[in-house]
């Protein structure tokens, strides 16, 4: 039996201030749908919350299914660089909500940018 799942890529950027979901085709060239925390909550402080991430993921999953995509590979990204390396609270809630909405989850990978001894961090600027 052949696997006839149509795949897309869900790029999830989760910081401690906001969560942004962008779904593209497999090449990454064409954006199918995108959403951020500010589209589903009123308060700025709630943009990064797991609740906002769940609401966003449900809206995104509906639009993705309408576009004919059955499954997504998830790429989670935190702030990175010389900022915090781990993603915010919305990352895990987003993945769980996408799966619950009926999308098949393929691979989950962390694509947070890691510096290879770049610039000095803001916390250790004072010698």
Curated annotation (Swiss-Prot):
InterPro entries: Ribosomal_uS11, Ribosomal_uS11_archaeal, Ribosomal_uS11_CS, Ribosomal_uS11_sf. The keyword Ribosomal protein applies. One of its GO terms (biological process) is translation. GO terms for molecular function: rRNA binding; structural constituent of ribosome. The keyword RNA-binding applies. GO terms for cellular component: ribonucleoprotein complex; ribosome. Keywords: Ribonucleoprotein, Ribosomal protein, RNA-binding, rRNA-binding. Signal peptide: none annotated. Part of the 30S ribosomal subunit. PANTHER family: 40S RIBOSOMAL PROTEIN S14/30S RIBOSOMAL PROTEIN S11 (PTHR11759). Belongs to the universal ribosomal protein uS11 family. Located on the platform of the 30S subunit. This is Small ribosomal subunit protein uS11. It comes from Natronomonas pharaonis (strain ATCC 35678 / DSM 2160 / CIP 103997 / JCM 8858 / NBRC 14720 / NCIMB 2260 / Gabara) (Halobacterium pharaonis). The lineage of its organism: Archaea, Methanobacteriati, Methanobacteriota, Stenosarchaea group, Halobacteria. The gene is rps11.
